[in-house]
Amino acid sequence: MDKKEVRQLIMNRRHELSDEDIEMQSGLIIDRLKKSDIYKTSENVFLYMSYNREVDTYMLLSQCFMDGKKVYAPKVLSKTQMEFYCLSDVNDLVSGYMGIMEPSDICDKAKIRDGLFIMPGLAFDYDFHRIGYGGGFYDRYLSEDNTFIKAALAFDLQLLESIPYEEHDLKPDYIITQTQFIRREN
């Protein structure tokens, strides 16, 4: 399968999940993350705002605020540029690029590139390759200097034995599903 076929396969699988399945499985994934040292020791959490039947990151956003973490969310500035901005609460979010919630204009741009970085993706494999939506926003953002711990949140159905990849594709350090917490060995 090529990347386009993998994207379609996973989107079809996610659309077969009921709202209740997404809520339950997302809860298990967030619970697995919040019990981990990578979450407990991170002051800063950079996370995507879920849409299109992704793992529900709004659960994580609420948990981060309860735990006193500094939370940053992405805002698409152009077809090739994305930046992260600090959120003080969920009311800082407004509808943005493709209808995805993003920080409003009152939010301050992140001045750091350090902490726990939650990566989105459609498909992952056990070699930590990742297929996103094809825009390259996260590969570009993460290619700049940073000291992030990169974690991908995914449903088990998004984890495949092998997926097509290119050498420049960035890999997460961890993949967390409702049943697995997988750490990449360097």
Locations of the language-model features?
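N-terminal active-site beta-alpha-beta segment that forms phosphate/nucleotide-binding
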Residues: 1-112
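Conserved phosphate- and dinucleotide-binding cores of soluble alpha/beta proteins
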Residues: 80-186
